[in-house]
Every structure is written in C-alpha cells, then in structure tokens.
C-alpha cells in the first residue's frame, strides 16, 4: 500500500465499475468526502465518497471511469465535502453541472464557499408563503397561482412543450409590488444539445439572461454530475436569497433524468431496488431537494421552486411524479390532448392544483374577485368537458340551450384563456378580465361561485 498520512493518497484500487471506483485499506475517510483522482496518463478527475465499510471506500467519479484501472490510478482524500464558490457575479452566467463556467466568461471569484448539501431550514423559523408571483401564464396565475416560497412542479409528457413553457416562465416571472431584486436559477439535467441550444438562444434573444443563472448538465455528461446539478443550483439560490436578500425562482428540468441517474448509480452499487428499480431512498433524496424551497423568518429573500418532470408513458402514478406529489404543494399538469389540438401552453387545469393559492391571492395581492372567478372558471369548464363526452353518445342536437352554452364556454376557454403565444406576458388583471369576458357566455343564473357584488362590478355589460 502506498499511503501518506498527510495527503491520504492511495493506489490500492480494487475495482472500477461503471461510474464507481473501490479503494481498499483506507483510514479516516468520511461519507460525501471529495476525492482527487489521477489517471494512469496523469489526467486529474474528481469524485465523492458514496459509502465506507470498514477499510473500503466506494467512490463515484464525476467525469466517468474511462481510462481508469486498478494498477496505476491514484486516489487522494481531501477531507472536504463538495462545495461551490458563490458570488453576485454569477447572475447572467452559464455553468456546467458541477459549477464550472461554460459561457466563455472569466472564472468566478467567490465571496463564499458553500457546502452544496445546504443546511436544513428550522421548521419553526419558516414563514408561510403568501406573496403572489406573476408568471404571465393565465392558467397558472389565474387558476393555479404560484406563491413566493412554494414548490409547484410541472408534470409533463414526452414531446410536450415543457421546455418552451419553462423558458417563458424564466423570462416573465416577477413579484408584483416588491422592490427586492428578482432572480431566476435555471438548472437543466440530462438534456440534449438541441434543448441546451434552445434555452441558450431563447435567454439571449429575449434579454432574460441578465437575471438568469444557468446550470447545464447534458445527456452525454456523466450521470453522477446530474446528481450534483440541482444541489449546485439550490446552494447558489440560498446565497442569493438569504445572504443577498433576493426573491429567487428555481426551475429544475428534468427531474426524471435526475431520478434515472439515481437508479443508474444505485444499480452500479448493487443496491436492493425499490419500486420499478428506483432506489428505496429516492423519496428522501427528492425531499432533500424540494424542501430547500421556502422563506425564513427575519430574512428578506425567498426560494420558490418549479421542478419539471416528464412522466414516463404519461403515467401520473409512476414513482417519480407520485413521490414528487407527496412532497410538493400541488402540480401543473400538461395535457397531450390539448397539445394535439394545437393549444399552447397545454395546461389541463382540472387535474392541476396549487395548494397554497388561497394565501397568495385576493385583496391587494391580486384582486378581490380572484378566488371566485377561479372557482367559477373551474366549475364551468368541468361542466363543458362532461358535456363533450355526452355529445359523443347522444349528439349535440339532444342538448338543452343551457348545455349548449357550457359547451361553447369550454371551446372558448381553451381557445382564449388557456391559449396564448410563447411571448405573451399577461398581467393578472388581464387574466381575470379575460375570465369575466368568457363567463359572459353563460346565463347569469349559472354564476353561483362568485359574489353578486363582483358580478355587478366586473361582468362585462352586453
């Protein structure tokens, strides 16, 4: 064995498998410790300790194990956990999944070095989320409102325009009536080069890059880097929010790729699989990410999360959306049926939900009629959708005049309220006024979920 007490350097590599490397005869090694690795040809790589049993350490290699062998590879344990250097200068910059600049700009001179695992928020010090965030998307702002400090995921399907929606939210999101600086941190995991180019071009074209910090992990990057990307992004968000006092929106896409990387590494470690082959600790791992959203009593800033995940086979009961739903505070569901009709964004409001919406709307936050309008739109659209199924059986001629109105409302709701262009940024007032304009289609006697005073004040006169 070739070891050095000071540097703890080892050449006792016993196995190299997938993204993992096993080192024997180690002493004083800790979980999550960072390891400097030197390949036989002198190349420098980094890794992290996944597991320590007696004198054996299992290391995940960030850059992959290609060209590593058991004879001429060196591993040096640093005694440090993974950290990222953070600074205000990260605004408007692009980094890879492990925090290295990829935009051709200079290296970041950090104000602080922070552990990427963060520190848990004391539940007693959390403030309840209750400030409205305007995304400019009517189906979100009007009916599934995003609130500052909330975690609200978007459930999508393969081929649906979640990337376009994510880019639009990153461009348009803002906190109304708040002088605090607003920042967006965009973390992409396992995306293709085509998708990466789309996001880069979109942010640059619209000028949104000034307020966006991007962490980009590509599909051909190592899976272990994918595990670090959301932690890098959230650590930066915590610095912006709780040190610099910014209002931060974190968009994480695609959490399905993150979970696939978890499964790949778990399989390489020969762990006992859980549901559908995913590791049993996936719930805990996802909770560690999602629970880093929130507000802290006495701190100006906040972290709001919008994780995006693609449901395999559009299955909302799949372990990834299923576990995400347990941890987060609602969901925005994209519909393949609406997408086939050419509707963008194809948000299906009926299965969508924002559990914290009630605390962030009404009065001086949005408008006093917001809750009633939202409830009435839900009710009327649900009625119209039910009648569509009936029409398929009995035909439209069998419907009453009242039913015809609800059917017309459903069509107009999809064509005018849900549908908007990819560059259209609707204010909450425009969204609510549009809702009232559509409710005018229905007989006034059917508007049972809004107060009479609001009907008199806001319903357009014939």
Swiss-Prot record:
Keyword Transport annotated = yes
User: Where in the cell?
Assistant: Cell membrane
Q: Specify the superkingdom.
A: Archaea
Q: Which residues form the signal peptide?
A: none
Entry keyword annotation includes Secreted: no
Which GO BP terms apply?
Answer: proton motive force-driven plasma membrane ATP synthesis
Task: Print the keywords alphabetically.
Answer: ATP synthesis, Cell membrane, Hydrogen ion transport, Ion transport, Membrane, Transport
* Main subcellular location of this protein, as a coarse class: membrane
NCBIfam families noted in UniProt: PRK04196.1 (NF003235)
Q: Its family?
A: Belongs to the ATPase alpha/beta chains family.
> What is its biological role?
Component of the A-type ATP synthase that produces ATP from ADP in the presence of a proton gradient across the membrane. The B chain is a regulatory subunit.
Q: What is this protein called?
A: A-type ATP synthase subunit B
Naturally occurring in which organism (per UniProt) = Methanobrevibacter smithii (strain ATCC 35061 / DSM 861 / OCM 144 / PS)
């Amino acid at each position: 064995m070739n070891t050095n007490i000071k540097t703890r350097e080892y050449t006792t590599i016993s196995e190299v498998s997938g993204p993992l490397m096993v080192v024997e005869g180690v002493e004083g090694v800790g979980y999550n410790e960072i390891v400097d690795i030197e390949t036989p040809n002198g190349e420098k790589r980094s890794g992290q300790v996944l597991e320590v049993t007696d004198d054996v350490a299992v290391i995940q290699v960030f850059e992959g194990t290609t060209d590593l062998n058991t004879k001429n590879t060196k591993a040096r344990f640093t005694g440090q956990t993974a950290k990222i250097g953070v600074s205000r200068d990260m605004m408007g910059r692009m980094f890879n999944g492990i925090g290295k600049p990829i935009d051709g700009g200079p290296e970041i001179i950090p104000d602080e070095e922070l552990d990427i695992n963060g520190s848990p928020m004391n539940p007693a010090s959390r403030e309840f989320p209750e400030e409205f965030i305007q995304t400019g998307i009517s189906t979100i702002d009007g009916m599934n409102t995003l609130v500052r400090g909330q975690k609200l995921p978007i459930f999508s399907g393969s081929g649906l325009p979640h990337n376009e929606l994510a880019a639009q939210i990153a461009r348009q999101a803002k906190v109304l009536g708040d002088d605090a600086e607003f920042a967006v941190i965009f973390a992409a995991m396992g995306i293709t080069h085509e998708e990466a180019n789309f996001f880069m071009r979109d942010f640059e074209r619209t000028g949104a890059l000034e307020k966006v910090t991007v962490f980009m992990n590509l599909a051909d990057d190592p899976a272990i880097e994918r595990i670090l990307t959301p932690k890098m992004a959230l650590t930066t968000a915590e610095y912006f929010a709780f040190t610099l006092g910014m209002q931060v929106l974190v968009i994480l896409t695609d959490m399905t790729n993150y979970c696939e990387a978890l499964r790949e590494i778990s399989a390489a470690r020969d762990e006992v699989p859980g549901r559908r082959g995913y590791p049993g600790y996936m719930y805990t791992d996802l909770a560690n990410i999602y629970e880093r959203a929130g507000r802290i009593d006495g701190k100006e800033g906040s972290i709001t999360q919008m994780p995006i995940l693609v449901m395999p086979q559009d299955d909302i009961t799949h372990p990834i959306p299923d576990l995400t739903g347990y941890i987060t505070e609602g969901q925005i569901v994209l519909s393949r049926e609406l997408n086939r009709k050419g509707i963008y964004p194809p948000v299906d409001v009926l299965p969508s939900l924002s559990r914290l919406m009630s605390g962030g709307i009404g009065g001086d936050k949005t408008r006093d009629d917001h809750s009633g309008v939202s409830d009435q739109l839900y009710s009327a659209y649900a009625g119209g959708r039910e009648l569509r199924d009936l029409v398929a059986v009995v035909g439209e001629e069998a419907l009453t005049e009242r039913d015809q109105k609800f059917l017309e409302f459903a069509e107009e709701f999809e064509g005018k309220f849900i549908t908007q262009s990819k560059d259209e940024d609707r204010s909450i007032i425009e969204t609510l006024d549009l809702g009232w304009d559509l409710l005018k289609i229905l007989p006034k006697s059917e508007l049972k979920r809004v107060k009479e005073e609001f009907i008199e004040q806001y319903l357009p006169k014939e």
